[in-house]
Amino acid sequence: NAMIQEIKTDVAMRVPGIEAIYTWKDVPQQRFTIAGQTWPEPSPYDRLLLDQHVRFVGDPVAIIAGENEACVERAMKMIKVKYEVLPAVLDPEEALDGPILVHPEDSWKALCPVGADNKRNLCAQAEDGHGDVEKVLAECDVVVEHTYHVKAAQQAMMEPFQTVCFMDMYGRLNVMSSTQIVYHVRRIVSNALGIPKSKIRAFKPRIGGGFGAKQTAVSEVYPAFVTWKTGKPSKIVFTREESQIASSPRHDMAVTVRMGADKEGNIRAIDLYTLSNTGAYGEHGPTTVGLSGHKAIPLYGSLDAYRFRYDVVYTNRMAAGAYRGYGATQGIFAVETSVNELAEKLGMDPMEIRMKNMVKEGQFMPAYYGETANSCALDKCLARVKEMSGWDEKYPRK
């Protein structure tokens, strides 16, 4: 976490083959998001192409354009940067309403009412529920309560992030990228460069894996800016190291579950709280966290009450993003582990407690946006798994 006090590029510019070097003083000062989401994006507009305020190790400081990789690497080593190092907040438990702000700037904005407040380090916050959770839990014969930590993880797709840009005969900026969000890229580049979408054509070939990482425009805006400024073709290809330290991993979440049941094994209440660490920027932060509850709690269809609360906080770590499961992975791990612990306390077969409580076709699901499970074969799937695995012969362990 630091402010750039001074950046010297004059020596680097003299390297043969260097076309241009851009710093935070050279880029548009309109904030945007690189999350691949439908407009208006739930993710806050909290990024600049280059910012005087760098928020994590991996934040870009300069864009260097040259004729080949060798001259660019040489020039990069000649850029001198003087920083004012600031205190950092690295623990999400300390971020909310803490003294260190990741985004103190007034130009930060949220387009959607997701409970975001940059002056509280909040990317999103919400609560919903049905029934009186505290009353029902107090009536339960058995209650389990634990916090489960799911750490950030990288997609590590075979093809790293890469983008090629060029101007065509119609004066359009062409952006060819390894992306999962080709239409969103057009809008993101438009916002980042401050140019009309009609001046941009975004397209993609087949991509060598994405798994959600490429639902964020990690690489596109930098060569797009270079080509728009110079009129010349440009490309960027992340190394494997760069793909690991400056991209879009899974959100680190701490999920606290309280779950109660009667002595017959009927699960009556679930209280779930998720603390999600979005890192230095808010890409997909407000949306992944919702699935940690809305995809986990509705698996149990006969609850008398539920409550789901969450906070998504900024920290001075690499920004997170989309990853297969999109937040449901973290929540389901926590809830299913709680069900196992509940079964152990009750002395029940964990398969039996699931068959007894799982959502069935036709059931109303208040925890899933008030929808009905119009098509659901979860009970049949679990029965088939039980049969194929020989569960009754293996449980309890002989």
Where in this protein do the model-derived segments appear?
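Flexible, low-hydrophobicity surface segments
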Residues: 1-115, 143-146
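Alpha-helical support elements that line or immediately flank enzyme active sites
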Residues: 1-24, 62-83, 162-230, 287-298, ...
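General beta-strand structural signal in soluble alpha/beta enzymes
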Residues: 20-25, 56, 144-148, 175-177, ...
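Short, surface-exposed loop/turn segments at secondary-structure boundaries that line and modulate
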Residues: 22-59, 93-95, 99-106, 184, ...
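Glycine-rich loop/linker segments at domain edges
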Residues: 37-40, 116-163, 169, 252-338
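Helix-loop-helix junctions that connect adjacent transmembrane helices in secondary transporters/permeases
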Residues: 102-193, 358-398
